Amino acid sequence: MIRIGQGYDVHKLDYDRELIIGGIKIPYEKGLLGHSDADVLLHAITDAIIGAIGALDIGHFFPDTDMAYKDADSAELLAEIWRQVEAEGFKLGNLDATIIAEKPKMAPYVELMKRRIAELLHAEPSQVNVKATTTEKLGFTGREEGIASLAVVLLEK
């Protein structure tokens, strides 16, 4: 059996936060604002995985009204969901994700992100693809107000 899920996340950029994307700390003057560490890439991936197994969404498992998840490490949240997915007998077929940001440039960090995500999903880096794009200065990402991410995942049982 195969299952496909897609996920999307967006967070506002803020001067008083660290920038963490794909589980990697990226040196930048701004970070992402959110209840957890606001890792848009890991949130999109987590939501895609949850969608693939038909289990609602990330907010159902980790509500932003629950102080237990205040400043939570998104890698730990993804790992928690992945344990449940593996317990149901699924493994990763492949994952494709896109980060949408005008700045900072993501290219220097993409390989580190791929390796970190593969580690969290007990997969090979070749099963994980991460890429980045801009919106050519259009919209909220183009105005550097926020960063978005999309993810598609294929699970196999």
Curated annotation (Swiss-Prot):
Residues the record annotates as the site (Transition state stabilizer) are 35, 134
CDD domains from the xrefs? MECDP_synthase
**So what EC number does this one have?**
4.6.1.12
- Which pathway does the UniProt entry assign to this protein? Isoprenoid biosynthesis; isopentenyl diphosphate biosynthesis via DXP pathway; isopentenyl diphosphate from 1-deoxy-D-xylulose 5-phosphate: step 4/6
The alphabetized UniProt keywords are:
Isoprene biosynthesis, Lyase, Metal-binding
* Keyword field contains Metal-binding: yes
Q: Which reaction does it catalyse?
A: 4-CDP-2-C-methyl-D-erythritol 2-phosphate = 2-C-methyl-D-erythritol 2,4-cyclic diphosphate + CMP
Q: What class of enzyme is it?
A: lyase
- Positions of a divalent metal cation binding: 9, 11, 43
- Describe how the cofactor binds: Binds 1 divalent metal cation per subunit.
SUPFAM superfamilies named in the record: IpsF-like
Tell me the GO molecular function terms.
2-C-methyl-D-erythritol 2,4-cyclodiphosphate synthase activity; metal ion binding
* Pfam families documented for this protein: YgbB
Residues that hold 4-CDP-2-C-methyl-D-erythritol 2-phosphate according to the record: 9-11, 35-36, 57-59, 62-66, 101-107, 133-136, 140, 143
Q: Which domain of life is it from?
A: Bacteria
Task: Give one GO biological process term.
Answer: terpenoid biosynthetic process
Task: Provide the assembly information.
Answer: Homotrimer.
Per the record, the similarity remark reads:
Belongs to the IspF family.
Per the entry, what this protein does is: Involved in the biosynthesis of isopentenyl diphosphate (IPP) and dimethylallyl diphosphate (DMAPP), two major building blocks of isoprenoid compounds. Catalyzes the conversion of 4-diphosphocytidyl-2-C-methyl-D-erythritol 2-phosphate (CDP-ME2P) to 2-C-methyl-D-erythritol 2,4-cyclodiphosphate (ME-CPP) with a corresponding release of cytidine 5-monophosphate (CMP).
Task: Report what the protein is called.
Answer: 2-C-methyl-D-erythritol 2,4-cyclodiphosphate synthase
Q: Whose protein is this, by species?
A: Listeria innocua serovar 6a (strain ATCC BAA-680 / CLIP 11262)
By which gene is this protein encoded?
ispF
